[in-house]
Amino acid sequence: ITTIVTLSIGSYVAWQGLRTWKTQLKGTQNYDLAKSTLINLNKYVESIYQVRNPAIWGGEYPKSTDVEKFNIHQDEKQYKEKCYVYQNRYDKIYNIKPYLQENVIEIEVLWGEKLKNKFKQLFALEFKLFIEIIMYTESFKHKNDEYKDASSYDEKIINATIKNDSFRDEINKIRTEIENDIQPYLKL
């Protein structure tokens, strides 16, 4: 009887230990995912803001030889320069986005669909910006009615410093919602 009681107590203690370990492991997993997601989310959003920065510094333009400067029409040169600048700026988004998408897949598996849908909204806004940039750069190449004047895209693309920036406000709203939903998982 003593052996049975001892084995029963030992089994109970072992079971409680495994349960505690499992809870700690899940808490650590949630914490690591939440931390990684918030870091990648902030890098992603900051990269979007950098794309929208109205200042284009001299170092961002492509290096060209003097011969190229004389052989290219001004509109074509301006088009190529803008494409180069925005492609380089967008590369930062392309570099961080796969990590964020990986986080979103993990979030969907562990925490459900709610956050995934918010990330979809954020990715849709970034895609909208991408299309606007294409239209903006094309406006330098095509000086006809098909494309608007480049200045008409300014408020959508480079409005990053104006107080009434609806695009930035929408991104910040989604970012805040995501951060608020992730916050509870940052507790160990």
Positions of PLM-derived features:
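Membrane-embedded alpha-helical transmembrane segments of multi-pass integral membrane proteins
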Residues: T6-I9, N42, F127
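Amphipathic, membrane-active segments
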Residues: K22-K63
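Short amphipathic alpha-helical/adjacent loop interface patches that line ligand
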Residues: L18, L41, R175
